[in-house]
C-alpha cells in the first residue's frame, strides 16, 4: 500500500487495521475491551472492517461497575445485537458484595476494586492473552509513553521501564504462560482524529456526546449529571438544567460534563479545534494524586 496516496485518516485507519489483524493472527485468545465510549466505537468499527465480511474472531468484554450512564447500557446492548458480537459482561462480585460506592468509598477505591480488579478477574476467568484497548497517547502523559503492544506480567502489571522496542510496524508479542499483552490500535490517533473519523464513517455513538439540556449540579469543580436517584444532595446543592455534553464517558458520579452547544458532529469538530484542555479533565479518577493514571496502570488498569 502506497502510504503517500492515503489521507491522514486513511493512514491511521490502515495502521489500526494492520494491528488488529496482527493480534488476531498471533494470539490464541484475544479480546476487545469495550467501554462504550467514542474510542471503543471507532475501535469496534475498525475491527469489523478488518474482518469484513466475516464476523469478529474475538468477543467484546465490558467490565461493568454498575455506575455507567443508562444511555451507555442501552447503547452497549443495542450495538452488540446489531453487529452480532459476542458480548461478555463482568462485574466484580466481591465489590458488589461489599457495596462499593463512588460516593461512599471515593473514586480511587471504587476504580481499583470495580474496574482494575474487575478487569483482572475477567482476564483470568477467560484466559485472554491479548486485550485490545481504546487508549490514545494524546489523552494523558502515562499513556503517551506506552507502547502499542504493552506487556503485562502474570499479575497484569505494567512496568514503564521494561517496555519492548517497536521498530516501524514490527511488534513483539512473545509471552510466557500467564503473561499477556494490552494492545492499543488507536495509540497514534488524536481526539480530533477520532471525531473526524466518526463523522467520515458515520459511526454511531452514545447521544451523551452531543449537547442537550441535562440535569446537573456543581460539585468539586465538576458538572455532575444526575442519572438516577443514588445521590444525596449536600447543603446548598441545586440540580439545574443546563446545555452540556461529555467529552469522555465513565461512571456518572466520576465524569464531569462540559457546557456546550455542539449538537452535531461538525459542531463538535469545530469546538475541538479551539479547545485547549484535555478531554480527561472531567475524569475524577485522574485527579486522585499526582501520576494517578500511571499508578493505576502499574496495578493492572487498562
Swiss-Prot record:
GO molecular function: ATP binding; sulfate adenylyltransferase (ATP) activity
One of the GO biological process terms: hydrogen sulfide biosynthetic process
This enzyme's EC code(s): 2.7.7.4
InterPro entries noted in UniProt: PAPS_reduct_dom, Rossmann-like_a/b/a_fold, SO4_adenylTrfase_ssu, Sulfate_adenylyltrnsfr_sub2
Class of the enzyme per the UniProt entry, highest EC level: transferase
Gene3D superfamilies (UniProt xref): HUPs
Subunit structure: Heterodimer composed of CysD, the smaller subunit, and CysN.
Family, similarity comment: Belongs to the PAPS reductase family. CysD subfamily.
Designated name of the protein: Sulfate adenylyltransferase subunit 2
Protein's organism: Escherichia coli O139:H28 (strain E24377A / ETEC)
Lineage: Bacteria, Pseudomonadati, Pseudomonadota, Gammaproteobacteria, Enterobacterales
Gene: cysD
Amino acid at each position: 500500500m502506497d502510504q503517500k496516496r492515503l489521507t491522514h485518516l486513511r493512514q491511521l485507519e490502515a495502521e489500526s487495521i494492520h494491528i488488529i489483524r496482527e493480534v488476531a493472527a498471533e494470539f490464541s485468545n484475544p479480546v476487545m475491551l469495550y467501554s462504550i465510549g467514542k474510542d471503543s466505537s471507532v475501535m469496534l468499527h475498525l475491527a469489523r472492517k478488518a474482518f469484513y465480511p466475516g464476523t469478529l474472531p474475538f468477543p467484546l468484554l465490558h467490565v461493568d461497575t454498575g455506575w455507567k450512564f443508562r444511555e451507555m447500557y442501552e447503547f452497549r446492548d443495542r450495538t452488540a445485537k446489531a453487529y452480532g458480537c459476542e458480548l461478555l459482561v463482568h462485574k466484580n462480585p466481591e465489590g458488589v458484595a461489599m457495596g462499593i460506592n463512588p460516593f461512599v468509598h471515593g473514586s480511587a477505591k471504587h476504580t481499583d476494586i470495580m474496574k482494575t480488579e474487575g478487569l483482572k478477574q475477567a482476564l483470568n476467568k477467560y484466559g485472554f492473552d491479548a486485550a485490545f484497548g481504546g487508549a490514545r497517547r494524546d489523552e494523558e502523559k502515562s499513556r503517551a509513553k506506552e507502547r502499542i503492544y504493552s506487556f503485562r506480567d502474570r499479575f497484569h502489571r505494567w512496568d514503564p521501564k521494561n517496555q519492548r522496542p517497536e521498530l516501524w510496524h514490527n511488534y513483539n508479542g512473545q509471552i510466557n504462560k500467564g503473561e499477556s499483552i494490552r494492545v492499543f490500535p488507536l495509540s497514534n490517533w488524536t481526539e480530533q482524529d477520532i471525531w473526524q473519523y466518526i463523522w467520515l464513517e458515520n459511526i454511531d455513538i452514545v447521544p451523551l456526546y452531543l449537547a442537550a439540556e441535562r440535569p446537573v449540579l456543581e460539585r468539586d469543580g465538576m458538572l455532575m449529571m444526575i442519572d438516577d436517584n443514588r445521590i444525596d444532595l449536600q447543603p446548598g446543592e441545586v440540580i439545574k438544567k443546563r446545555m452540556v455534553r461529555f467529552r469522555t464517558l465513565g461512571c456518572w458520579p466520576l465524569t464531569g460534563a462540559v457546557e456546550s452547544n455542539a449538537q452535531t458532529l461538525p459542531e463538535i469538530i469545530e469546538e475541538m479545534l479551539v479547545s485547549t484542555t484535555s478531554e480527561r479533565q472531567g475524569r475524577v479518577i485522574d485527579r486522585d494524586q499526582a501520576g494517578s493514571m500511571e499508578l493505576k496502570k502499574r496495578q493492572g488498569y487498562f
